[in-house]
Amino acid sequence: MNWKVVLAIISCNIVFMSASYTMLIPFLPMYLTHELGVDASHVNLWSGIVFSSTFVVSAIMAPIWGKLADKKGKKLMAIRSSLLLSISYFLGGIVTTPLQLTFMRMFQGFAAGLWPMDLAIMTLYAPPKKLGLCLGVMQGVMTAGGVIGPLLGGTLAEFFGMRMSFFLAAAGLF
C-alpha cells in the first residue's frame, strides 16, 4: 500500500482517537452533577479523578500493548484498540454513577495503544527519507484531535444530549 494512503488513513484514525479522549471536557462537570448525581461540592474532585484515570492506566498499558503488537501483529492490535475504545465510549453513555464513569475511563486507558500502533505501522510503510515528515504529520493531527475533541463534545452534548454524545463517539471510533 502507498505510504501516503497509509498516512491519510492513520491520520483520520488519530484525529478520532485524540478527540475521543478530550471530548468530555466541556460537559464533564454537568454530566457528573445532572446525570450521575454528584453533589456540587464534590464535582471538582470527581472531574479530576474521572479525567485523569484514563491517562494513568494508559501510561501503564501502552508499552504492554506495544509488546503484544510485536508478537501478535501491529494491525491486529490497532483494530483491537479501536474496538475497545468504541466499547468504552458506549459504556460512558450507560453509566449511572461517578465510580462507573471512572471505571469506564480506566477501561478506556486499558484500551490505549492505538497511538503506538499507528506509529509502528507508519514506520513500516514510510520511506526512510519521509519518516520524519510522516511522524510530524501524525503528531500534528493528534494535537488537532485533542483541540477538536472539546468542540465536538460540546456540540454533540448541546444538540443531542450528554449521554448521546458518548454513543456517537463510540460509533465514530468503530
Language-model features: where?
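Residue-level signature of mid-helix packing/kink "hotspots" within the transmembrane helices
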Residues: 55-63, 113, 146-147
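Symmetry-related core transmembrane helices of the 12-TM Major Facilitator Superfamily/SLC fold
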Residues: 165-174
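Paired small-residue
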Residues: 88, 99-107
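Pair of pore-lining "gating" transmembrane helices in MFS-fold secondary transporters
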Residues: 3-27
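Small-residue (Gly/Pro/Ala) motifs that create kinks and tight helix-helix packing interfaces
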Residues: 29, 145-157, 161
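Cytoplasmic helix-loop-helix junction between adjacent transmembrane helices
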Residues: 104-142
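Conserved MFS/SLC helix-loop-helix module at the cytosolic interface between two early adjacent transmembrane helices
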Residues: 60-92, 96
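Extracellular/periplasmic helix-loop-helix junction of adjacent transmembrane segments
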Residues: 31-58
